[in-house]
Amino acid sequence: MEAFQELRKPSARLECDHCSFRGTDYENVQIHMGTIHPEFCDEMDAGGLGKMIFYQKSAKLFHCHKCFFTSKMYSNVYYHITSKHASPDKWNDKPKNQLNKETDPVKSPPLPEHQKIPCNSAEPKSIPALSMETQKLGSVLSPESPKPTPLTPLEPQKPGSVVSPELQTPLPSPEPSKPASVSSPEPPKSVPVCESQKLAPVPSPEPQKPAPVSPESVKATLSNPKPQKQSHFPETLGPPSASSPESPVLAASPEPWGPSPAASPESRKSARTTSPEPRKPSPSESPEPWKPFPAVSPEPRRPAPAVSPGSWKPGPPGSPRPWKSNPSASSGPWKPAKPAPSVSPGPWKPIPSVSPGPWKPTPSVSSASWKSSSVSPSSWKSPPASPESWKSGPPELRKTAPTLSPEHWKAVPPVSPELRKPGPPLSPEIRSPAGSPELRKPSGSPDLWKLSPDQRKTSPASLDFPESQKSSRGGSPDLWKSSFFIEPQKPVFPETRKPGPSGPSESPKAASDIWKPVLSIDTEPRKPALFPEPAKTAPPASPEARKRALFPEPRKHALFPELPKSALFSESQKAVELGDELQIDAIDDQKCDILVQEELLASPKKLLEDTLFPSSKKLKKDNQESSDAELSSSEYIKTDLDAMDIKGQESSSDQEQVDVESIDFSKENKMDMTSPEQSRNVLQFTEEKEAFISEEEIAKYMKRGKGKYYCKICCCRAMKKGAVLHHLVNKHNVHSPYKCTICGKAFLLESLLKNHVAAHGQSLLKCPRCNFESNFPRGFKKHLTHCQSRHNEEANKKLMEALEPPLEEQQI
């Protein structure tokens, strides 16, 4: 109706708003305004259809807001809108129809769920209702949709498991099918979910025996995604149904989980505001399934994990696939942590109140379900068995988790103690190896809370890690390490992490020792800790050994301040990554020891020089002075002959763009000797300045104009930046800031120095056809092409010579 009114209104006004033009009809005025006053296009009511035309000033183009139609002529877009986007009545009808179509399916699915829900206790009813809203709208959330929507599966699962498969099967049919039609992007997911749900019901009669379901399901998870979904569903079914006597527990757990997936309050709000499309619950069900899986099967673990990313290890171990969606998952658990304190006190209160209960009951349930589903070696081995998924996932997971973590840690500490404590009683089998609450506290929690939030992130991770580590039988540790390595965020963590795993197995004292002298830890204590623990951790241990191998190097330098420590670690981590590749085969303790020693002896010097060289100015200065002295004695002798060339260079250096690598430090020293007047007249440097002038300082002597650079000191002609830099070095005695500590060559740019230093590390490149050797791949490549062509010419000559004599003989 509004559109109709708008149509009528303009018909009354036939004058242009911006000039004295008067048109014969509304369309005439519209086209005049769009053509003559395009800048007001955005405010115009195009054809009575609203602000449909957008004018792009930079390109002088008119765009239709409803589609991608674009034209330079306003009239074209105007007619396009009136014809394609139709009269307002059609336009108004369309949205209504679409809305009806979209909302119907949304409404209908909830009904099945509520119908099911009546079968459950009253508590579940309300929860599903809540979750349904969050779901409906939540699933729409773009990235987060998986998080909110996961609620759906919980609900269906819960009712399903408690109620019976019959109810569940109806759910899949109406719910996913309609969403499938509605939700455009994720219909495929919804369909799989249907299948998975239909599959799940099959286990669901027996899911009450979570144990049988979970191991198979976990193995299934490895087999392929759909089975995974099935596997998770069974698992969710399993534990919930197992704890079905405690339906409140379930009610509590799914509810918190609800918010947790919807975790961030904003997401839930937006979730609600979002369109009905959310009925991607069915799609969401795919990620969610395994969320319940963590929510329930790892429940014992989850108390503690709730506090730390560790929990997410447990979850994923259950199935590699979770890693794919794990970012959502991880944030899920993280967010529960958040909701606990702030976001949804409602949901979370149930959990704490229930927490001692659920955690214990679930253990009672879980002792079975745990032993069978999570602990059963088959299930656990299989999940970790796919390290690829782990490795692929962790980075993302880590990214999400760490980002959230600082806040969470702040909020969580209160939660953690409760959760932690319930945790240990939960599954004694798993927890006890972890070192019992006391052990874990000394090893991690108290110290950790003292540590910076960052360290808390990981150390809690490490704390939970012991549990999940042992339960996941070594798959997790290395993966964790790898995941930590993948991100630079955790400079100091690797170490804190290491102590974490080792601490639990050792006495609390040992753990605390490890925490305090992180840097001075001997490799032995950790090795015994890690190697004996899970035999499978041996490979992980080797990465740790590697870490240690490189950490000792930082120790040498990092013994001074602690700030360098983090920097060094980050760098040593890079090195560690290299080390990881090189040392993958080193699994045994002895090999690790040997590697540690070797690396301590050999690599620290190079690595630290290479990686730390640009960052540590002190080192540079010292090296500089010593190298100056050495060079002045040794290289002047060698380069007497070069002096003449250098003098020649001085005169022509303005025009020539000398290759950066060709300027030897010795030559520069020579230059200093040969052109003292210039240096006096132009710039007086202290030794320190000579030793270290940054690129920015060099830029002070250079001005830019019209894309070229000029020397500010003299009036040389405009040149490229590199040429001016060389002019400054050669003519005006401005020292190159970056010098190679190995050979003394100086470079104007840090990147060039890095390349040069890297070349030192490489073995000499030798030409197969002649005696040419080079450290520099670029020059060597040039030589090869040259040598090859020369070689080909020679070969051709020989061939010709060989062919010529027979011809001569024939002529004779």
From Swiss-Prot:
Please give the residue ranges the record annotates as the region Disordered: 86-124, 136-546
The C2H2-type zinc finger ranges are 738-760
A GO molecular-function term, please?
Answer: zinc ion binding
What ranges does the record give for the region Mediates localization to the spindle and the kinetochore and is required for the attachment of spindle microtubules to the kinetochore, renumbered to this chain? Answer: 451-590
One GO process term, biological-process aspect:
protein localization to kinetochore
The keyword Ubl conjugation belongs to this UniProt entry's keyword annotation = yes
Phosphoserine PTM sites in chain numbering: 87, 108, 173, 184, 204, 214, 217, 244, 247, 253, 264, 275, 282, 286, 297, 308, 319, 344, 355, 376, 382, 386, 405, 416, 427, 432, 436, 443, 445, 452, 459, 462, 472, 476, 507, 512, 542, 572, 603, 615, 626-627, 632, 651-653, 675, 736
Q: Where does the record say this protein resides?
A: Nucleus; Chromosome; Chromosome, Centromere, Kinetochore; Cytoplasm, Cytoskeleton, Spindle
Entry's Gene Ontology cellular component terms: condensed chromosome; cytoplasm; kinetochore; nuclear body; nucleoplasm; nucleus; spindle
- Per the record, where are the segments of Basic and acidic residues compositional bias? 86-105
- Region Mediates localization to the chromosome and the spindle and negatively regulates chromosome alignment: what ranges? 591-812
Regions of compositional bias (Polar residues) in chain numbering: 220-233
Q: PTMs?
A: Phosphorylated by CDK1. Mitotic phosphorylation is required for the attachment of spindle microtubules to the kinetochore.
User: Bias category Low complexity: which stretches?
Assistant: 363-392, 499-512
Protein's job: Required for proper alignment of chromosomes at metaphase and their accurate segregation during mitosis. Involved in the maintenance of spindle microtubules attachment to the kinetochore during sister chromatid biorientation. May recruit CENPE and CENPF to the kinetochore.
What name appears for this protein in its UniProt entry? Chromosome alignment-maintaining phosphoprotein 1
Species whose genome carries this gene: Homo sapiens (Human)
